[in-house]
């Protein structure tokens, strides 16, 4: 059984009936319920299709946050081989919210940086729900500089509600660490490809997303602040997050129209959590195509194109 979101109730009801019939069929094999089960399965798929054809920005936010959605470690296991993770920022500590190191992608050496949220209570606490501290961003800069030194393409996977806002993080220079990470990305003379696989929240996301090519999964979100945060600022009421999401242009479709991202990666019907391998493989193909298009490009050209890409966003929206 899936973890159904509130707006998926019609599908949940139909799937519940299907399970009941299958259970009866198993207990009383003499009853042939295959036709009824097939009819309900068709209705369930139709209902799911109807719902996902017209998701609101707030509903997409819920899908992007789905507890069963594939996270960075799922992508790493399927897309990367010979993984060699590095730990620590060489200044203070290790931050597991950001996973980073070197690996092979389709046989080619790459550097990678990924934000990991965790799948259960234990791993969510371990990874701090994907909210990195300054040490995580300083570790990311370490990897970026090494990738640049060795001429390795950099792949980044974004999935965070935002950088950790705690007092301890602020004391250790959270804002400076985010700024330095963003600046380091813009200085690189190697191809950089970023994919927003779930949430792309605020500076915590942009710190590793200033890439030559930026893609989003179909139901991912990317914004300067979470809908709850925006609602708290605008209306002093986080309960109005739904209203904020409607006005923030946070969906992949909105951001592609605004030319902030370079492409949208299709998800299986019902979201990436309903077909993890399909979603991850589709992401791998997009990354591969993006890297091939940048093979042989001069490092200074890559750096300048990346810089112009972000300057153009401000100009085009002015």
Curated annotation (Swiss-Prot):
Taxonomic lineage: Bacteria, Pseudomonadati, Pseudomonadota, Alphaproteobacteria, Hyphomicrobiales
Matching Pfam families: ACCA (PF03255)
A cellular component term, taken from the record's GO annotations: acetyl-CoA carboxylase complex
Subcellular location(s) of the protein: Cytoplasm
Chain ranges of the CoA carboxyltransferase C-terminal domain: 39-297
First-listed, main subcellular location of the protein, grouped into a coarse class: cytoplasm
EC numbers for this chain: 2.1.3.15
Native species: Bartonella tribocorum (strain CIP 105476 / IBS 506)
GO terms, biological process: fatty acid biosynthetic process; malonyl-CoA biosynthetic process
Entry keywords, A to Z: ATP-binding, Cytoplasm, Fatty acid biosynthesis, Fatty acid metabolism, Lipid biosynthesis, Lipid metabolism, Nucleotide-binding, Transferase
Top-level lineage group: Bacteria
Protein name, UniProt field: Acetyl-coenzyme A carboxylase carboxyl transferase subunit alpha
Subunit structure: Acetyl-CoA carboxylase is a heterohexamer composed of biotin carboxyl carrier protein (AccB), biotin carboxylase (AccC) and two subunits each of ACCase subunit alpha (AccA) and ACCase subunit beta (AccD).
Reaction it catalyzes: N(6)-carboxybiotinyl-L-lysyl-[protein] + acetyl-CoA = N(6)-biotinyl-L-lysyl-[protein] + malonyl-CoA
Entry's family note: Belongs to the AccA family.
Function description: Component of the acetyl coenzyme A carboxylase (ACC) complex. First, biotin carboxylase catalyzes the carboxylation of biotin on its carrier protein (BCCP) and then the CO(2) group is transferred by the carboxyltransferase to acetyl-CoA to form malonyl-CoA.
InterPro entries given in the database record: Acetyl_CoA_COase_a_su, ClpP/crotonase-like_dom_sf, COA_CT_C
One Gene Ontology MF term: ATP binding
Pathway given in the UniProt record: Lipid metabolism; malonyl-CoA biosynthesis; malonyl-CoA from acetyl-CoA: step 1/1
